[in-house]
Amino acid sequence: MGPFGSNIKAECFVEEGIPVLNGSNLTSYEINDGALRYITIKKAQSLGRALASRGDVIVTHRGTLGQISYIPDTSKFKNYIISQSQFRMRLNKTIVMPEYFVYYFHTPEGQWKILSNKTQTGVPALGRPTSTFKKLSIPLPSLSTQAKVVEFVHSIQRKINTNNQINDYLTELLDAKFDRMLEGSGSWSEASLLDIASYKNGLAMQKFRPKPGDSGLPVLKIRELGQGCCGADAERCQSDIDEGVMVHDGDLIFSWSGTLLLDFWAGGDAGLNQHLFKVTSESYPSWFYYMWTKHHLHKFIAMAKDRATTMGHIKRSALADSRVLIPEQGTLAELTNSMQPIVNQVITNKVECRKLSELRDALLPKLMSGEIDASKVDITQLNNHLSDY
């Protein structure tokens, strides 16, 4: 089990050391190394059983139930500290591969086994989490069969990881091109963010629940923007909401309250919740208003942090006060020829990652049940099936 909160106080955190995991690091099969905080090696050693290593499985037992991830051999760090809402499992690898174990609990059957042990009052939690998990039974094929399933998932994950790495490079390239652009912008005309784009606020989607017979749309909130998709537990809204607050792949979304985020959405059709802007323009290409909004993002984050008495946010006046430099049409066209294809490729890669994830999740239960033989799935042909998702 993770340490009590009182064992890791704010003053324990340092710039580098042993990373501390939280729920945001358990969003997929493998842990991710985003938004980590650190404690000293000495402090980590004092926490004993809260220390997790490569090959360990981490489970959330309080809060966002259903989260379960393993620490891969390729993790950025050798050791991690789990939070007070998590527990660590160290499996007998002569019987079960950690990857296969985690995959099972990501299937509908596995999720049901976890969530059926949820307590019914207060904060969502597993009753007697470690002993409860020890009593769960799962079907285990031979290690060779497990390895086939694991290799199939790894093959998809490698493609997803490659796309993400390409997007990291393309994002850096966009930043470099934008910085170079600013060096020659001395004679350009001035405007504001509100002059170049529309920042459409979402709706309080709890007022627009699906009507009987309407499967609805998932609601895009700040959490979903941060994780890049709408999970199975996302709230839903009616499917005939106004197009102005309907989000499609490639739309630029800016959360202006709470955690300020800016990203191109690639999670499929959704309804835009309040506290997020859908950014569009009839006069300028998406790269232009994206890069200028991003240019001011650090300022917006600082402004939100200064609002200590309320949830951090920015006002629309901040957009009106944010300067934009606009080149003449010929120069803008040249810049667009250089910048827009990069943005388009980033979006294409993000959408492909989502579809690969959906394909993986659809096939995984069939692979684990033996309905599909993993050794007979040709990973090189997966792209031919992405249009089905």
Sequence positions of predicted segments:
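Short coil/turn segments at secondary-structure boundaries
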Residues: N7-E15, A35, S116-K118, S189, ...
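Amphipathic heptad-repeat alpha-helical coiled-coil/stalk segments that mediate oligomerization
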Residues: D373-Y389
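Sequence-specific dsDNA recognition surfaces
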Residues: M1-E11, S24-V57, L194-R209, G216-D249, ...
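Non-catalytic DNA-recognition/assembly elements of restriction-modification systems
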Residues: M1-K9, K135-A204, L225-G228, L325, ...
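A short beta-sheet element
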Residues: N22-G23, K42-G110, G122, I241-H298, ...
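Extended, non-catalytic scaffold segments that flank or surround catalytic motifs
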Residues: M1-Y29, P98, Y103-T107, L115-Q120, ...
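A short glycine-rich beta-alpha junction/loop motif
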Residues: N79-F87, T119-V150, A270-F277, R307-A333
